[in-house]
Every structure is written in structure tokens, then in C-alpha cells.
Amino acid sequence: MFDTVCSLPLSSDLFSQAIHPTEPLVSIGLSSGHVQTFHLPAPSENGKAGYGHIDTVWRTRRHKGSCRCVGFGIDGETLYSAGTDGWVKAARTETGRVEWKFAVPRIGDKSGFQVDSPCLIHALSPQTLLLATDSGALHLFDLRDRSTEVSARPQQTHHPHDDYVSSLTPLPPSETSTSGYSKQWITTGGTTIAVTDLRRGILVRSEDQGEELISSSYVTGLKAGGTSKGEKLVVGGASGVLTLWEKGAWDDQDERIIVDRSLDGGESLEVIANVPDELGKGKVVAVGQSDGRVQFVQLGPNKVISELSHDDLEGVVGLGFDVQGRMISGGGTVVKVWHEAISDEEGNDDESDEEDIENGEGLGKKRKGGNGSSDEEEDSDDDMAGKDKGKRKKRKRGKGKDRSGGVHVMAFKGLD
């Protein structure tokens, strides 16, 4: 069972959320262009993980337009962000200080170039950064080759789908891999999935699935037998259905699980996260929906075993589990932290102000007031910040926002 530790109100709509691979840190990108990093409480001496305060490590106006996507590097020391201002910036996770940046490749010709807004960023390895854009391009950047900030060019560019890339899931490295890093990944976009190789480019495109594919996750450790290898790709669609794809059989789906049975056709499944094995019964995925609910689906029996509500109106944009097994859900103007329930006590509500935090204060230290910035190039451009509502919100059915920031205690009946 899980309860909310707290609900953290945000100053503007959440566009992207990233969870640190080894530390209790969460970073977010907002529609206002701000990027903010939080430090979650460490386990207390009495063993109650997750109780305490969530501190702002740093907060800054990183992009002049909306911050579309954020993502940590493989080792967690670097936080990448990309915005509608056409810039990708790499900052130190601990301080927020920008170390280098480069321009998103533009589209058009000599008669007129325009920004191709980013929609997804992912560090595949210490050497390779993947960046997807609204035009459907998927760029590969070599992080070892840092040319001047304006002239940086991708090593490769692919167009795996007719539409923009809605999700990206790396495939596990092969048994013969010497680096230990993935060299292939699966993307969803439009009504298809595609498999791309670091060296050979696009390998496979699936058949048209007849519905928009939005989210994905890769699950290992399933029961093998017959043609099943015990590994499946889980894909979330716009009509409330999860599809399962057998490893290596990427041309068409293998199984279907109806997650949302709404009378109007089902809510779209915006984001998928694998529940840590120690928290679930068997293999379980958490699915964030456009109506603000999170549903938990057990693979094998292929059924929904529990659900909770992140928000009554706004959809779930970010979902994942931190290094201590706490679930982090984000959407609308709130981020919520959930821990495995120990008692019926409510978590403490963090009413921290939405102030700017100057870098260099260290993890977990909060400075109130001031207008410090961790990026010398940052300035205000409120007119640009409001132009990018459509991409993230186009599948949302609810309107309005939950401004209360109150604590909501929910239980997972199937996960205790």
C-alpha cells in the first residue's frame, strides 16, 4: 500500500519530470521555462522512509519559452533540459550551473528557418544524447564532441514515425555488450512503434495500429515459454488500452489489456513506469492517465489490481520511482510523492514558496527570497512562455487546476 508523503504545488504547469538514478532528487520542467530540482527526505532512523521535508535545491528560469523536457545523464551528475527557445542546456545537477549548451537543429530553408521545438530528451549512454522534436526528427548527439554552442550538429538524424516521437524506451544491452549500455531503443509515434540501432539506424517499423500510441516501458523477468522470451514492451494508447509486444516480434502487438473502460472510449495512457519488484506482487506497471488517475496493472494475469488519483482534473505527465522506492507523480500544477504505507498517518504538506534558488547552496539547503539565477543568459520572456500549452495538453479532457496542494491519502489494495 502507498500513501502520499506530500503534495507540492508548482508555479505553473508541469511539462516534464525526471528522477535521479542514484540520489533522492527530482527535477521538473515547467511551462514558464523554469527548471527546478527537489531533494526528497532520506529514511529516518525509525525506518519510516519518506517522512520529512522536500527541499528546493535550486530553481531558475532556464528557458525563455516553455521547458519541454528534462532528463538526467547516466551517472546523474548532469541534468539536460530543452525548451521552445531552441536550446538544449546541460547543467550540473548539484548546483544548476549550466556547463554547456547547443541549439536544437532548425527546420526550413534559407528563406526562413524556424525553431523545431523539442519533445523528448534521453541520455542513452555517457557518449550519446537523443533528442526528438515536433517535426518527427530524432537527433543523436555525441557528447564527446562539444563544438561551439551555436554550430553543434547531430551525428545522425532519423525520422522513425510520421508524427512526433511520443515515448522512447531503451532496450537492454545484449549479453555480448562490452560497454554495458544500450545501443538500441524503441520509440512510439503516431500509430506505430519503431526500433532504431545506434549504428545501423531504423531497423523495424510496426504495422499501423489504428490508434495513437503515447507511452511505453520495457519489462523483463516475465514467465518464458513457447515463443515468449519473458520480455515484453508495454505500450499505452489513446483509447485506454495497453498493448504487449513480444521481444523481437516488433511488427505487431501480442496481447491487449483494457485499462480504462470509460463510456466515451477510455482515457489516454500518458505515461508508464515499472513498479519495483519489492513493492508489487509479481510484475506490475503503473499507468498515468489523462484524467489524473494512476492505475496499476499486473502482467501475467493482465489485469488492473489497484488505482489512485493524482488529480481530479489534470492529467498525469510524469510518473516514476526514486532510488528509495517512492512513487513520484506529476501533472497540472502539482507533484506528489508516495511511499509504501506504514501507518494511517498523513504525510506532512510542504508549503515551500516558489522562490528562485541560487546555485551553490548544496543539496537540501534552502534559501528564501532573492532573485538569484544559475544561468547568466537567463532572462524573462513571459510572452513566449504561454505559447506552448497545446503539445502537452492536447489529450487532456479536464479543465481547470487543483490549487489546494493538500494531502490526499490513497491506498493500493493490490500492492501491500
Swiss-Prot record:
Compositional bias of kind Acidic residues: 343-359, 374-383
Record region (Disordered): 149-183, 343-416
Skewed-composition ranges (Basic residues): 389-400
Localization, UniProt: Nucleus, Nucleolus
InterPro entries tied to this protein: WD40/YVTN_repeat-like_dom_sf (IPR015943), WD40_repeat_dom_sf (IPR036322), WD40_rpt (IPR001680), WDR55_POC1 (IPR050505)
Record's compositionally biased regions (Low complexity): 166-179
GO cellular component: nucleolus
Segments annotated as WD repeats: 9-48, 62-101, 112-151, 214-255, 264-308, 309-348
Family: Belongs to the WD repeat WDR55 family.
Protein name: WD repeat-containing protein JIP5
Species assigned in the record: Coccidioides immitis (strain RS)
Gene label: JIP5
